[in-house]
């Protein structure tokens, strides 16, 4: 199994995702996703954990369930990611980081040039303690990227809606 990852790539690619001049309505949770959460004893407002497996090119969304533990909600195939297996260690290394990252509503961008996007908060506490550097590492839509993790618009819209309600 590949190392666990959270967002990655080139800072130039991710930070160029400025706000569009036209505001758009952010994606909302579908009734289907609400039913999936309910079936797994999860509430929409429960905390979220996102992890990405580089080798498998998969993004997982985990939420706290009624037991108070994180449980897997859904796995999504990724369109693109850059770098190689192994951790990100410094700003500008074009390497995707590997670790666990807590996503909060303040890290969401509903006006991304790539549909919607969110920052996964690299570096996490362990990476900071190790002296790893980097910022503005995103997951976004449009299934095209020169650095960040890219998903289809429908995938990132659903993930965005899950995170926004947390």
Which residues make up each language-model segment?
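Bacterial N-terminal signal peptides
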Residues: 2-10
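Bacterial Sec signal peptide processing site at the extreme N-terminus
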Residues: 10-36
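Short Gly/aromatic-enriched secondary-structure transition segments
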Residues: 65-81
